[in-house]
């Protein structure tokens, strides 16, 4: 039986998922306010999907971090088919507008097992601590910190690490090293085999952690869900 002293969790598609209404509403903002060439809502939603996938893939490939503002500007420019569409767009103001859409249409818990399993895990391993290690794209860490308490995750994590705040993305070992350093600073020395990183991405989460000598468990993108963690304790 493996009993870990610290559980590091990915966030998106591990503990939470996007609100379908959010994807519609964010495209509506761009269509109504940043759409000089009159593209349809469907066209703008399709551009968002492309930029979302591309942005995540680029961050994983380079280990760096594209800023949320850059991604929104890409959407506006690509949808319009011209960089002239960016004239007069203020990136910080644009992000503030888009953050309001997230706050009005917050992410949802991944599934009904998520919060009960985390609570059971805490009861079974009361000495264990939890943290987040999350790549971000259109939604920054500062915005996620605002919405997580409303999802029943308040007080669950000793600390939260987001790629936009760290300037690096999983699987970059620099990001996993930040996890180890933060862990040592908050709970003292801990051996890597006493930590487990849990996520849905075989490259960013599993390979990234294992390259640093940290055990890793894949959930949700395979045939096992978060309840698998209870079978390990």
Placement of each model-derived feature along the sequence:
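Asp-based, Mg2+/Mn2+-dependent phosphohydrolase catalytic module
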Residues: 1-9, 17-18, 39-42, 115, ...
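N-terminal helical cap/lid subdomain that shapes the substrate entry/recognition surface
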Residues: 2-116, 124-126, 141
